[in-house]
A protein has these predicted regions:
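Non-catalytic pre-domain segments flanking phosphatase-related domains
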Residues: 1-85
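Alpha-helical substrate-recognition element adjacent to the catalytic core
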Residues: 34-49, 70, 74-78, 90-199, ...
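C-terminal cap/substrate-recognition subdomain and adjoining C-terminal extension
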Residues: 2-6, 142-256, 260-287
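Residue-level marker of motif borders
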Residues: 81-83, 115, 238
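Generic structural marker for isolated residues within well-ordered, non-membrane alpha-helices
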Residues: 26, 57, 97, 182, ...
């Protein structure tokens, strides 16, 4: 696919976006990057054309709290066929299992395991078993309470999905969390696919176990590849978005991977990283 040939640096555009982008930042970044033109994409997103130098841009943007991305000119969303998204702390602004744990009074313990898992310190399947075991005895109705009262979409999620659907992309959420939430998110956002783990329930209460094979890092990639093949798409036509170490395999199976407010290990391996703006900031990476 032409969008992913190896390019000379002078062929790249530099995308700058943030909560508040100052003119002086744009002028300085254009100088640092050797860009010859600055154009506004949206209110706080800008394209610096023909950027030929990268070395000083990351440190400047980190200090100024700006997102940056070196992108190939003229790559359009319609060149892609599928966007695959993690759910917790990506499509959603919460960790759903942590919120269930809060009702059980074990949020601190579960959240600690969650964070260690996202940093890659614990194998996902084992961490999910540990966290789910702490939920034993929770009333099944607590899941609906969490969905109704605590689930929040990440900023820009609906705008991003609307634009991607308009461009012809299929949409999929793949989660190491629970299908109670992914099924409802799929319906709410009119997604094409949703895959997640299933909690075991007996007599209206969680048993502390997960049914079937756990969807973790490898499982996410397997699901993505299966759907990609069913759709007749190439790897280069896939966009994957995630935040934790268990998303890395899924992201590696995509042509473009985006680390969204992600752990350092994920940012280091992703095609692009978004740290300051919402999910709709992803749209500004394409023309």
């Amino acid at each position: 696919m032409a969008a992913y040939k190896r390019l000379k640096q002078c062929d790249m555009n530099l995308i700058i976006q943030g909560m508040e982008v100052e003119n002086r930042d744009l002028r300085e970044l254009a100088k640092l990057a050797g860009a010859n033109d600055i154009e506004r994409i949206t209110g706080q997103a800008f394209r610096l054309r023909n950027a030929s130098r990268r070395e000083l841009v990351p440190d400047y943007c980190a200090e100024a709290e700006l997102d940056f991305a070196f992108v190939e000119p003229m790559v359009q969303l319609k060149e892609f066929g599928l966007v695959a998204m993690d759910m917790d702390s990506t499509l959603l602004a919460i960790e759903s299992i942590d919120e269930i744990a809060d009702i059980q009074g074990v949020k601190a313990q579960v959240a600690e395991i969650t964070q260690r898992t996202m940093r890659g310190e614990i194998v996902f399947a084992e961490s999910l078993r540990q966290r789910t075991a702490l939920l034993q005895g929770v009333d099944q109705e607590a899941l609906q309470f969490v969905y109704d009262n605590r689930v929040r979409l990440s900023p820009g999620a609906e705008k991003m999905l609307q634009r991607m659907k308009s461009a012809g992309l299929k949409t999929m959420v793949i989660s190491g969390g629970f299908n109670f939430f992914t099924d409802r998110i799929k319906s709410r956002l009119d997604l094409d696919y949703a895959h997640a783990n299933t909690l075991d329930v007996e007599n209206g209460k969680l048993t502390g176990k997960v049914l079937g094979e756990i969807i973790g890092a490898h499982g996410k990639a397997e699901v993505l590849n299966k759907v990609r093949e069913e759709l007749g798409l190439k790897r280069e036509q896939i966009i994957a978005i995630g935040d934790g170490a268990n998303d890395l395999n899924m992201m590696e199976a995509a042509g473009v991977s985006i680390a969204y407010h992600a752990k350092p290990v994920v940012q280091a391996k992703a095609t692009y990283a978004i740290n300051h703006v919402g999910l709709d900031g992803i749209l500004n990476l394409f023309e």
